Amino acid sequence: MSKIFVNPSAIRAGLADLEMAEETVDLVNKNVEESQAHLQAEPIEVDALPEDMKRLQISEPKPCQLPDGTCMKEEGGDEDFYMAESGDPYIPLQSYLDTMGIQIVRKMKTGERFFKIWSQSVEEIISYVAVNFPVPPGKSLADKSTQTSVEKSKPASQPTQPKKEDQLSKVNIDSQESSGPPALDWAATNDDDDASVEAEIAHQIAESFSKKYKFPSRSSGIFLYNFEQLKMNLDDIVREAKGIPGVTRRAGDGVRLPLRCILGWVASTHSRRFQLLVNSDKLNKVMQDDINRYLAY
């Protein structure tokens, strides 16, 4: 008959587990007693309640025996300061704005530019508000005169837009033979810029900040250069880029900018190292070709 030997350490461990289990049971019982302490007190007498509590009616409300008008007044007395959801005009507006937000997110996922999406969404929201929230007829005449003057001033400025577009589309081909970036056609002026245009320019430059572009060197070869090597603030680069013909207009449309042309122009003005490496005549031709190609679209 074989003998079974038990390790003393296993016995001690088992005893320790039993002690811990007993302590756990005692702790659980104590917590249960504490949580049910309020049930061990004397029951509350109804007569001992405050006077206001006696008015509380637990039974179901009886149907109104009075005329209809009186019942409606009593039931709706507490709701005088609240508007029904069906009569609130801002609930449809909120749902419309939620729908517009979902559409904006979907368009951004497809790769469209944010500022282009936002401008279209703003126009749709303005038209929705104009249709569903018309101006009341009791408006003052001062507001109407202000709106009339604005509407009259807009048609006067519209004929100038085709002229600007014609100027932007014409690039001086003869300037390709001259040397240096100043030979660019600066007659093609940019449109009036705003914060959204600057943000679009900064966004595209920041995306390609470390990308290297090819430039013609003095040794009849090429060298690589990027925006990081300028060691300039992004705001300063954007300020210089806005002076290049067509950049502001393309940024306003949310389309791709001639980044190599922008880099070449800024570097040829602010980077001594770039000036020593680049062939000015060929650089001017490269920049002019970029502008012609981008303005053609």
Curated annotation (Swiss-Prot):
This is Phosphoprotein. GO terms for molecular function: RNA-directed RNA polymerase activity. The keyword Disulfide bond does not apply. It comes from Aravan virus (ARAV). Non catalytic polymerase cofactor and regulatory protein that plays a role in viral transcription and replication. Stabilizes the RNA polymerase L to the N-RNA template and binds the soluble protein N, preventing it from encapsidating non-genomic RNA. Also inhibits host IFN-alpha and IFN-beta signaling by binding and retaining phosphorylated STAT1 in the cytoplasm or by inhibiting the DNA binding of STAT1 in the nucleus. Homotrimer when phosphorylated. This trimer is stabilized by binding to the L protein. Binds soluble protein N, and ribonucleocapsid. Interacts with host STAT1, STAT2 and PML. The gene is P. Phosphorylated by host PKC and by an unknown kinase. Residues 138-172 are annotated as: DYNLL1 and DYNLL2 binding. A motif (Nuclear export signal) lies at residues 49-58. The modification Phosphoserine is found at S210, S271. It comes from the Viruses.
